[in-house]
Amino acid sequence: MYAHVVSLGVTGLDGYPVTVETHISGGLPKFAMVGLPDSAVKESSERVRSAIKNLNCPWPASHVTVNLAPADVRKTGSLYDLPVFIGILAAQQYIPQPEPHQAFLGELGLDGTLRPIAGALPMALAAQKAGVTELFVPAENAAEAAVAEQLTVYPARSAADVIRHLAGQAKLSPASRTGYDAAGQWLGPDFADVRGQAEARRALEVAAAGGHNLLMVGPPGTGKSMLAKRLPSILPEMSFEEAVETTKIHSAAGFLPSGVPLLKNRVFRSPHHSISMAGLTGGGSTPRPGEISLAHNGVLFMDELPQFTRPAMESLRQPLEDGVITISRAGGRATYPSSFMLIGAMNPCPCGYFGHPTRACTCSQTKVSLYLNKISGPLLDRMDLQVEVPPVEYDRMADARPAESSAEVRRRVEAARQIQRRRYAGTGVTCNARLTPALLKKYCVLTPEADRLLAAAYERMGLSGRSYDRLLRVARTIADLAGSEQIGPDHVAEAIQFRNLDRKYWQVTAKEL
């Protein structure tokens, strides 16, 4: 007796079809599972056996072989419980053989209840691509799987519901599908709460408008973390494609919040400085996404940047340039998207008061230099904007007048991003920070005065080729915020102003030593 059931798996970020073949033959009772299952998959035999008996269904008193094809790809997780369950019953002709256009996913409880799984969205999209039209999933995963528009998704709370549906006794109702709409009003921290710090606020606005990286340097308590946490409130809304891509990553990692089928707000990730390189970039024996991939299309905030390990910080360099990261491990190889905005915050020295207007720094020049040099030149070079966050004067702190709100700043950011979307339509680029050298040359047109100013800055500041390109991208964003198609001297001057911290701190301490 033989049955085959369609299921799915996930490798990296992408789903793939899996055929669950069940063969019941003569011989002593035994259950064997082949096809590179991991320990969680192997354990499904006991869950399936208990579920079948507790639902008063027959368990074969003979040899049962289950094959998960393709057999050369390792299968992980408990999501194959339901298809194995269906396969055993279908092989005994207790229920009809499922059709090739039907697929099944779900973990079983011992009483036959269905429990949610990770990776429902990438697997649903893979099922749709493979020609599957009906997908049976645990009820908690139904809204997420229903994002795949060409699938009919059937939510089930128990394997008994699936049996009755296949037997034609009681049909399951398809999951409702709601159209994609905007995230709505921002309910998180607002820029109106911030007192003073006009330069830092402007830097965050420019960073949001162009998708640029930003480094904030200042003494403790001046609002660096407060400012960073308000950055998502001024970022443009995600498109449907961006929302799906972001949700796929969180779903595959098992981090999608319960009851949230699609992430609509841009992600803000803030890992602790004790995080390992594998935790930051991704890893494990079987590759899993790390913080830089979980921050895709959003913000990665690294507070107390010099406290991170050197390998962790240096691992950011390639993803910041390429927007993807490839992880190779014994359990496989996976490529994850990692197009994120990096926001770093740090003190200027170990005690935090180097250069403070009123408090004396207790660090020696050697300590200051060693502390600052934890940030390597190549990583500092990738910070498009560098801004100082000084102490706020009392008059500004006590000012009761409301500051500019996030909604007002966001309107300007949205207008600048709309200009960029129209300009780069059909190129695959969505913001200025992702401009390729060819597009940079084509779209970053300088006035003669701006060109002379940039040439002087290039020589005087000793900019690298990468720094030059990044400065030009920032100037392009500032011009977009001003509604100017050409980049003028004022736009270049402001972009240069946001590249001065390395001269103030890193180069000065090096000379003093």
Segments predicted by a language model, with ranges:
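Short beta-strand elements
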Residues: 18-24, 280, 384-387
